[in-house]
Structures are given as C-alpha cells and as structure tokens.
Amino acid sequence: PELMVEYKLPVIMENPDGTPRGKGGLQPDEACEFAKLLEGAGIDMIQVAQANHTGNMGDTIPPMGAMPYNWTLPVAERVKALVSVPVATVGRVVSVEAGEKILEDGAADIIAYGRSLMCDPDIALKAATGEPIRECLNCNKGCVDAIQNRKYISCVLNAENGDEATIAIKPGEGDKKIA
C-alpha cells in the first residue's frame, strides 16, 4: 500500500518587529527553494511551520498576542505558488471561518489545526452541522506549558481534554440559567 508522506518545513519566521523568531530552520527564501526540491523528490504534501531548536516552546507556539493570526501564512502562500503538491499552514488559525477564507483565497490547501483541536476536538463535525465551536484562546495554559514542563496535556476551555478516559461530561437536562 502507498503511504502519503508530508514534510513539515521548518521556517524561521519574523517577529512583528522584524527580528527572527526561533533558530534551527530555514529562512523563507531557503524554504521556498527547498520546497521545490522536496516536490522533485516525490514528497506528497508540505506543511509550513515555525522552526524551533531553542528549547522554548513559546518560540514555536506563541501565546495570545505574541504573533498575529495566521502568522505562517505568508510563507505558505509563497511555497504554494512554487509547488503543485498540497501545502498546509498552521499558526493561530483559530476559527473555522479564518481557515475557510484561507482555503477560498487559495493561500493554502490544508489548515493544520493544533491547539484548536485540543480546545474542541469536534471542530470539523460542529462546522459541518452549524453547532457552536469552542475557539482556542491561544493562552498556552494546559497545553504548551504542560509540554514544556513534561506534564499531561489539558485545556482551560475543555475540561475533558487529557481525561477523556475517566470523565464523561454529559449535557444537563432542560434549560438552566447559570450565573
């Protein structure tokens, strides 16, 4: 059987002040050239992501306010213009509407949700059925800080995250007013 191979392209993005963010990856121009080589080698998909070999998770997965929404998208757009394989983007794409706009604009082929899925693992189903989606705050409390401190992952907005096997939260019966 064939196996799809995705390459996560580590790019050193820029902070809002123009300084490099993280270490150990490719500059955007290098990433674009490397993406063409990857396609030529037969890769099936490329995910443009932040590079980080600093040991600081905040460099890779910035907390709210540290980076703009969709912050890896400019490099993903450049890569997509150069290759014919699908290109994914990741990085503070916090709503389904934002992801749909990126896809509609042709800026990327796939949205790689990360923290959003920890916050609401049913995001795709809810988007399809019109149910309200719990949107990630990008607070990094329970997810990124837990990884950094080698603890189990949780989410401040999703009480079940990390305890799915032991907690079964069920909807209450009838309408209730809760203060």
Tell where the protein language model's regions lie, with residue ranges.
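Flavin-dependent oxidoreductase catalytic cores
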Residues: 1-179
